[in-house]
């Protein structure tokens, strides 16, 4: 489904070059639940950004369903991000003045889905993460764990093939972290 072949990522920093990734080879199959571990600054987020199409590799190839991305155009990357990938970030990235429901619907608004279908899909995603009774709340009225579940629902609403979660429990207490990881594990089975 997804393969990284000899991926390198080099950043220029002033006069210096930083090798963020050097020769990464990985394969992911459908329904794999994978954790990428390592010390701070070792390239984990860079690799997730490359897999998610948010950043581009310097050398190597990212192969999606047997197709090389070397010749991907902007519209190919846009389609990949909008329809194949769901992102969950440590800092939630929720819009404070919008309700929980509106925050989840936003992902579908960008994909051109009708208002009725957006609402139906967003409610289903929020139900999947145990927040169907919180639709009208604003993010400021929720705990960190609840906000992370909203972020997970937003990642799920497009029914993506791949969920990329970058330190999804980093800002949460131990008990809530376990709950969030259980939700992510359950999602990977579907």
Regions found by a protein language model. Name each.
Residues 1-190:
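ABC family nucleotide-binding domain
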